Amino acid sequence: VQTGYTYTMNLNTSFSGDDNLYVRLKSGENGSQWAVKETYHIETKDWSDALSVDKMWYTFPVGDNITAFAGARIENYYMYVTPSIYKPGALKSFKLGGNSNFGASTDVGFGFKYETDGGFAVASNIVDKNSDSNGLMGKTSVSKWDTQVAYTTDRWHVSATLSDAQNWTSQSYNATSLGAGMKGSDGDTTGYALRAYWMPEEVGTAVPEISVGYDTKKADTPAANAAKEADSW
């Protein structure tokens, strides 16, 4: 029998009533047995008993239709129009396919989301894992820039996302075997993601909710004997 624990504290602060400064503190000690689980980021995180800042970003409105994001510890998928019925924690783990274009690592990032009352939306954001030492969007940046176009109603959603990664180092995270093979390249990839979901009019009936997705990702300069392209669904 192996045991462990996790502790999470979510802090939300508003200065105007329309903005929000979000900080997530997290601690835990669970050992290596949790590191390979697909639900690792939902159930626990191994901080060796230290209470640390796990997430931190600021959200504020720009006019009536734009929401802006900026933070020292943020991920791409927090700045999208939600492309799945799954909640954000599960979205990161499942991603509707291995090595999805929605994967990212927590670091410095910023972006915006434009939403109309009719359901149309556009979102674009970038996260840079190397910004602390080399600044944002430079030649040596370890970054992922995603742009999404979406249409959402009360019961269904469709979206398409372009993901451009530079020197990316997380190709193998939660990936299929083929997707993990792309880690041998220089990290530059171009990917496309399609998402859709549908919910029945009445909740709790025998009619299921449906959420589907398809991703394709191609290495810009694949290494020898490394995967050039990976698909997932």
Feature roles, as predicted:
Residues W47, G138-K139:
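Charged, low-complexity surface patches
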Residues Q33, Y78-Y80, D132-N134, W168-Q171, ...:
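Extracytoplasmic/secreted cell-surface and envelope-processing proteins
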Residues Q2-S131, A150-D154:
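Outer membrane beta-barrel
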Residues G118-G119, T140, Q148-W233:
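Detector for outer-membrane/organellar transmembrane beta-barrel domains
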